[in-house]
């Protein structure tokens, strides 16, 4: 159950962080307006709170593991939101990142 909770929190964090960054990008770079950018700033702020709900108490471990989700989520966001087409190296790299995330978060440990 803790693995499912942790994975769900990583997905929520990715939606806030990647979505927030995308909104800032759209607002500034694509000139959609400052309301888009402001929405992005709010989403990025919300992202900062999500990690505090992770069951593991080690900040460094949580953020390091989240990196794998961020990489994979960013590629997926690009596919859905921008029509990006990842190549085999993008996919292989994302899979390596996910394997690293799983190892960091859920490898058996003796007391910590």
Curated annotation (Swiss-Prot):
The keyword Ion transport does not apply. The keyword Acyltransferase does not apply. It is a multi-pass membrane protein. Its main location: membrane. GO terms for cellular component: plasma membrane. The chain crosses the membrane at residues 8-28, 33-53, 62-82, 88-108. Keywords: Cell membrane, Membrane, Transmembrane, Transmembrane helix. InterPro entries: UPF0060. It holds the Pfam family UPF0060. It is found in: Cell membrane. NCBIfam families: PRK02237.1. Belongs to the UPF0060 family. This is UPF0060 membrane protein SCO3297. It comes from Streptomyces coelicolor (strain ATCC BAA-471 / A3(2) / M145). The lineage of its organism: Bacteria, Bacillati, Actinomycetota, Actinomycetes, Kitasatosporales.
